[in-house]
Amino acid sequence: MVGASSSYASPLCTWFVAACMSVSHGGGDSRQAVALQSGGRSRRRRQLSKCSVASGSASIQALVTSCLDFGPCTHYNNNNALSSLFGSNSVSLNRNQRRLNRAASSGGAMAVMEMEKEAAVNKKPPTEQRRVVVTGMGVETSLGHDPHTFYENLLQGNSGISQIENFDCSEFPTRIAGEIKSFSTEGWVAPKLSKRMDKFMLYLLTAGKKALADGGVTDEVMAEFDKTKCGVLIGSAMGGMKVFYDAIEALRISYKKMNPFCVPFATTNMGSAMLAMDLGWMGPNYSISTACATSNFCILNSANHIIKGEADVMLCGGSDAVIIPIGLGGFVACRALSQRNNDPTKASRPWDTNRDGFVMGEGAGVLLLEELEHAKKRGATIYAEFLGGSFTCDAYHMTEPHPDGAGVILCIERALASAGISKEQINYINAHATSTHAGDIKEYQALAHCFGQNPELKVNSTKSMIGHLLGAAGAVEAVATVQAIRTGWVHPNINLENPDSGVDTKLLVGPKKERLDIKAALSNSFGFGGHNSSIIFAPYK
């Protein structure tokens, strides 16, 4: 894992070197300056005159150092020429050797992170910066269809994991999930659309409109909004898999049997688009898909749109509905799922040695984010303030976390810097913790690295009760985080009976809910591809 400057500098150096070499000609040890076009400015001429290219790696190093003075870039593009940008020089290395090489470079990544920590002085954002607050929430989950019911079930330690009933899964080794048993779009989505849309879109539209209702945004209130500054950013990891699956089945008979809406209703962006069309909102509108980190990416980007003045109001979050044959089969093929079919409520077990995989869930979570003065002007109830967040990439493996937790640590450190708070101010963390050995342990180690022995800190995993909602996980867990701030109660970790070795259980919430006066709360979400995200909420003051 490298710092931000390296992540931008390395590709830039590659192209700059290629460009300079293409216009220069070298032989032996001679040096020739890059020629300028006849119309070039004198300042550019002086700058580019530094970019001399000679044969051998030393000249390339000089070029990188003189033209693009990025510390991490010169560190990773050293005398071994440019092959380090793309991988090992040896083509004979097998997969395991290549992965070991990547892990071996983690020391460099950690060094860059230390540089980041030294540079990131905790500073409060300028007073003139627009503040972002949460004024509404909507959910569709296996534990409830509104934030209050959902969180009350979490506080009671109730599990939403059960036998799958939506289709016959008797031939699958996994037959359990966090399936939503009773779902209705009545009053939220037109019946005609309900019959045609994928369930992920129905969850999204329903949760989005419920967030507006929860925020007191009636038709009369919305009439006062500047709709060019109202946006929707609700993502999905998998999109309309059921619509696509049904289209394939229809195509086996004839293309004439296919749903004419199968293409638009399968894309991940169409949910946000349909909600904006329904509301007439003309501000930022798109979707993000970063696997299980999707929701946090959407929430942070939405907040940034508000901070930059591009929007006053944003509906943001995530939605996924993949408890269907192709979705279940895909994760079974990955050997990622729990097979505790005879005791489904005990299947999701973050930080417990008796885990045997994660449990799929489904649903949607949507936050109504609003610029503070906009919210105050209309008399909105403010649930919490959004302080900041961060994204990073492990750049290591498709599904496994970085062995040093470098990407997660860097993400948390940057989130704290973005929020302008110290690590001591965080006393609640809603962890990603999916009930997989590698993921649970690496996240715990990253938290221990970042926060040390803070006796006030409490950590829990919402997934212990609802399973993993994939692209919707972060948003639903953000709702749980905001509810913890509002109520002063944090929900338990269920099924934590035999903690992993090295895990300090004093850090983790026990089997019962606990009272906690939250100063600031961190919510983590990580996704396949090494996507890391951390967002921070606090009580509004």
Swiss-Prot record:
It comes from Arabidopsis thaliana. Keywords: Acyltransferase, Chloroplast, Developmental protein, Fatty acid biosynthesis, Fatty acid metabolism, Lipid biosynthesis, Lipid metabolism, Plastid, Transferase, Transit peptide. Homodimer. Residues 1-103 form a transit peptide. It catalyses: a fatty acyl-[ACP] + malonyl-[ACP] + H(+) = a 3-oxoacyl-[ACP] + holo-[ACP] + CO2. The keyword Cytoplasm does not apply. Coiled coil: none annotated. SUPFAM superfamilies: Thiolase-like. PANTHER family: 3-OXOACYL-[ACYL-CARRIER-PROTEIN] SYNTHASE II, CHLOROPLASTIC, POLYKETIDE SYNTHASE-RELATED. The active site is at C292, H432, H468. Essential protein that catalyzes the condensation reaction of fatty acid synthesis by the addition to an acyl acceptor of two carbons from malonyl-ACP. Confers resistance to low temperatures by maintaining chloroplast membranes integrity. Involved in the regulation of fatty acids ratios during seed metabolism. Required for embryo development, especially at the transition from the globular to the heart stage. It is found in: Plastid, Chloroplast stroma. The gene is KAS2. This is 3-oxoacyl-[acyl-carrier-protein] synthase II, chloroplastic. Residues 129-539 form the Ketosynthase family 3 (KS3) domain. Its EC number is 2.3.1.41. Mostly expressed in siliques, and, to a lower extent, in leaves, stems, flower buds, and flowers. It comes from the Eukaryota. Disruption phenotype: Lethal when homozygous due to embryo abortion before the torpedo stage. Converts temperate oilseed composition (rich in unsaturated 18-carbon fatty acids) to that of a palm-like tropical oil (enriched in saturated 16-carbon fatty acids). One of its GO terms (cellular component) is chloroplast stroma. Its main location: plastid. Pfam families: ketoacyl-synt, Ketoacyl-synt_C. Belongs to the thiolase-like superfamily. Beta-ketoacyl-ACP synthases family. One of its GO terms (biological process) is cold acclimation. InterPro entries: 3-oxoacyl-ACP_synth-2, Beta-ketoacyl_synthase, Ketoacyl_synth_AS, Ketoacyl_synth_C, Ketoacyl_synth_N, PKS_Beta-ketoAc_synthase_dom, Thiolase-like. GO terms for molecular function: 3-oxoacyl-[acyl-carrier-protein] synthase activity.
